[in-house]
Each structure stands twice: as structure tokens, then as C-alpha cells.
Amino acid sequence: MNVAIVKYNAGNIYSVIHALKRLGITPTLTDDAELLAKADKVLFPGQGEASTAMAYLRQHDLDRVIPELRQPVLGICIGQQLMCRHSQEGDTDCLGIFPLDVKRFQPQQHTDKVPQMGWNSIHDLKSPLFKGIGDGEFIYNVHSFYVPHHEDYTIATCDYILPYSAALNRDNFFATQFHPEKSGGVGEKILRNFLEL
């Protein structure tokens, strides 16, 4: 299987590469449009700042290439946020794959910490991406921004300060706010499910 990872100026790419290697897949890290289009599956992971990431994507024409991909695509963390329409982070226009806006967590009480860092549970699982995953399983998060729940696109929810979209799906595009590559056996199962789509 030919698996590509979108290369751009975002951290945490190599933990995804290592997670895929544990599943027997050696992915290609690339920002080449032709290689991305030819891949069987594409992953779009990363951690970083939205406006900086979008500037790189535009500079390399990836803002056009990614939304036109026809194979299964999985965005992870900032990858999910960049697949949305707009992010409050840097007042950034994003790829628009999901017609949703990314918002910053607003602490409601003094015990609320931003960013969310650590383990939390996912619920309301509605996709083959979560085949064999039980409601309430724990996944690993590091993020200050979130996508609100949307009836048409949310395929998993999480609750931190408020309920939000832990995962999204539209056609061939999937995305998780959490890090499957850092979520132990549950995350490995989610990645395997994606590869089997």
C-alpha cells in the first residue's frame, strides 16, 4: 500500500511515521502534488500555528491539491483544523473541506487549563474509522483550539470545557483532533481502520 504524509512546516510528523511503521507501512513524506494524488491513502498530521501552516500550504499549492484528493485522507490535530473553513488562530482562512470554524477554548472557571493536554474519552462514535473501538475509550490530546459539534460532520465527540468534535468526516476526508499515533492500542486500531478504508 502506498501511503503518503503531507510534508509542511508542522511538528509531530515523525511520531506518525513511526506509528505507521509499527503497522508495517513505510510512508512517503512529500509536498509533491503528483505523489499525493497517486497515493492510496494520505495523512495530514501535525502540530503548529494555523496561519504559518496555511502560508506554507499556499506557497506549495497544497491549498489547491489537498481538497481535490479523491482517496481517503486523514487529518490529525492541526490537520483537522486546517481542513476547516476558518480558524480563530491568527484569523486564518483554511482549506474549507469542512464548512466549519475553529475556535479557541475559553476557560469557564479557574480550574480550566488551556491547552488541553493529556488523556480524555471519546463518545458518539459514528464511522468505520472507529470499528472495534468502544464508546468512552481514551485518546491523547494536545490542543488549544477545537471544532464545535456539527450534526452533519461530527463522527466522535469529546468534552473539555464544552463538548466538541473529536473527529470529522465528509466524503473521503476524515480528521481527528486527538493524536491516534500517541493513543496506544486504541490509536493504533484507529490508524489500522483508516488504512483499511
Regions found by a protein language model. Name each.
Residues 1-4:
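Extreme N-terminal starter segment of soluble prokaryotic enzymes
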Residues 39:
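An anion/phosphate-binding loop that grips the pyrophosphate of nucleotide cofactors and donors
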Residues 43-45:
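Structural motif
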Residues 48-116:
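Cysteine-nucleophile active-site neighborhood
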Residues 85-162:
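Pocket-forming structural segment of enzyme catalytic cores
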Residues 136, 169-174:
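Beta-strand-turn-beta hairpins that frame and shape the catalytic cleft
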Residues 176-197:
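Acyltransferase
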